């Protein structure tokens, strides 16, 4: 079930402050964040965020298409190695 409209999008407060500071400084630095649950807002477009996936910060450049999604969607936490091969079929 999606979030009700009257509540508005969820964004951690410190994230807004960091984004405003990055825009004011004009530098193109990666902003390290741990808040995977925060919604991407239009004011984040053009900034690069380092979204923590449990092991490292994955760089995510925010584009207009990402607005409304969560940061965690763009930083996978699990590594997929593929399905194990069947030993019988390998012998042939």
Swiss-Prot record:
Pfam families: Ribosomal_S19. One of its GO terms (molecular function) is structural constituent of ribosome. InterPro entries: Ribosomal_uS19, Ribosomal_uS19_bac-type, Ribosomal_uS19_SF. Keywords: Ribonucleoprotein, Ribosomal protein, RNA-binding, rRNA-binding. GO terms for biological process: ribosomal small subunit assembly; translation. Transmembrane segments: none annotated. The keyword Ribosomal protein applies. Protein S19 forms a complex with S13 that binds strongly to the 16S ribosomal RNA. Belongs to the universal ribosomal protein uS19 family. This is Small ribosomal subunit protein uS19. The gene is rpsS.
């Amino acid at each position: 079930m999606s979030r009700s409209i009257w509540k508005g999008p969820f964004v951690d407060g410190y994230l807004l402050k960091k984004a405003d500071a990055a825009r004011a400084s004009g530098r193109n630095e990666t902003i390290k964040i741990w808040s995977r649950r925060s919604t991407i807002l239009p004011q984040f477009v053009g900034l690069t965020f380092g979204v923590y996936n449990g092991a490292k910060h994955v760089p995510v450049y925010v584009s207009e298409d990402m607005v409304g999604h969560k940061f965690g969607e763009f930083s996978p936490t699990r590594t997929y190695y593929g399905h194990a091969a069947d030993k019988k079929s390998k012998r042939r």
